[in-house]
């Protein structure tokens, strides 16, 4: 449905009753300079294990008239597909809230905000991750509401370079900014509304040297989607209940291996 979760989260899928184990990077080994023969301070183990023990349940329960079902006026497969989609939306809304609650406690260069996309604020955040990665710029990932504003920060006033004009016209965004690849968030609208699924006012800085296990957003899915069905003779209805167990948490070790810029205008 979207590239949001795969881009920002460390996701594990376990069987029923199993616990997801996440390894969180800690401060790691340090080196010290001292007089010859002196005792060197010890370095702590470079990672710890975090377990998401408790899971939550997201459920949906579509009901259909039995006669309509038997006469093929309603396709149960379509109802189940719609129910599963609504469950996924509910899960993602919860996971996004978990992340949002955490990131607003972070400080620069991992979290910053401004009125619009402020070059003087965003650029130091990009440079931080370039240094962290040994020269590799982070990806800039966000809704087109944010990524489309990056062209204005390129330093061209009144007249853009031809390449930027072509990129902006073809994709709605420029391809790179300060060496960072600009990636559009796939942000579908919630059914029967004009409300996007994910925040439109955040630009995520995703460092390329970080694998999924280092991301602070941890998500676990316990088992597959289960279904239970029943037929009711009193009102001639048929129903299916779908359940999925999941949970999310933000766990920060030595640092949050992601950056977030928020536009306070939106």
Model-derived regions, located:
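Assembly/oligomerization interface modules of large self-assembling protein complexes
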Residues: 1-58
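N-terminal short leaders/motifs
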Residues: 4-10, 85, 188-198
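Residues in well-ordered beta-strands of folded domains
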Residues: 23, 51-53, 61-63, 141, ...
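A short, structural micro-pattern
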Residues: 56, 134, 234-236
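Alpha-helical scaffold segments that mediate packing/assembly in large oligomeric complexes
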Residues: 59-133
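Short loop/turn segments at secondary-structure transitions that flank enzyme active sites
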Residues: 89, 93, 146-148, 246-248
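Extended, solvent-exposed, turn-rich assembly/linker loops in the middle of proteins
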Residues: 103-174
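Sequence/fold signature of self-assembling virion shell proteins
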Residues: 156-266
